[in-house]
């Protein structure tokens, strides 16, 4: 069986590397995706990636995917998007939620997530390495 993971990155993550590096780090999104692609390839898993600032594009990608696992950094949509939550529940694909920063150590409005209670797990505060942790966990579950 071919295993596939869909990696979703939400709004403003295209600015990684130059947007508030003290919070989000210096790596670009392209750097992060390249590292994850190598990790996935080494495990024999296909990695599909989408980044969008438009909620509907992320929802359409969720609806269209044939992946068996999703890793999502919903970014600002974490705190606002019931539609993204409904899309994930609608396709019934297990997912991990990832955040570069520790959202619980930031402004109170960032503490609430519409996705966390439905995620397999939530990884936050480890910077770009959080994606690697999520992918390792996804691969382990896919290969179990």
Swiss-Prot record:
Presence of the UniProt keyword Cell inner membrane in the record: no
GO MF terms held by the record: 3-dehydroquinate dehydratase activity
Enzyme Commission (EC) number: 4.2.1.10
BP GO annotations: amino acid biosynthetic process; aromatic amino acid family biosynthetic process; chorismate biosynthetic process; quinate catabolic process
Record: residues binding substrate: 73, 79, 86, 100-101, 110
Gene3D superfamilies: Dehydroquinase, class II
Catalytic reaction equation(s): 3-dehydroquinate = 3-dehydroshikimate + H2O
Pfam families cross-referenced by the UniProt entry: DHquinase_II
UniProt keyword terms in alphabetical order: Amino-acid biosynthesis, Aromatic amino acid biosynthesis, Lyase
Signal recorded as keyword: no
InterPro entries, alphabetized: DHquinase_II, DHquinase_II_CS, DHquinase_II_sf
Record-annotated active site: 24 (proton acceptor), 99 (proton donor)
SUPFAM superfamilies attached to this UniProt entry: Type II 3-dehydroquinate dehydratase
Site (Transition state stabilizer): 19
Functional pathway: Metabolic intermediate biosynthesis; chorismate biosynthesis; chorismate from D-erythrose 4-phosphate and phosphoenolpyruvate: step 3/7
Subunit field text: Homododecamer.
Similarity comment: Belongs to the type-II 3-dehydroquinase family.
Known function: Catalyzes a trans-dehydration via an enolate intermediate.
Protein name as it appears in the record: 3-dehydroquinate dehydratase
């Amino acid at each position: 069986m071919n295993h596939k993971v869909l990696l979703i990155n939400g709004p403003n993550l295209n600015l990684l590397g130059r947007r508030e590096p003290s919070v989000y780090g210096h790596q670009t999104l392209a750097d992060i995706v390249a590292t994850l692609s190598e990790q996935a390839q080494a495990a024999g898993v296909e990695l599909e990636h989408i980044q969008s600032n438009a909620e509907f594009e992320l929802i359409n990608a969720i609806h269209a995917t044939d992946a068996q696992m999703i890793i999502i950094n919903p970014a600002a949509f974490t705190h606002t998007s019931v539609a993204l939550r409904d899309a994930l529940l609608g396709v019934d694909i297990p997912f991990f939620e990832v955040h570069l920063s520790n959202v619980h150590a930031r402004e109170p409005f960032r503490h609430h997530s519409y996705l966390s209670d439905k995620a397999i797990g939530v990884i936050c505060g480890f910077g770009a390495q959080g994606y690697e942790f999520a992918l390792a966990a996804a691969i382990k579950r896919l290969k179990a």
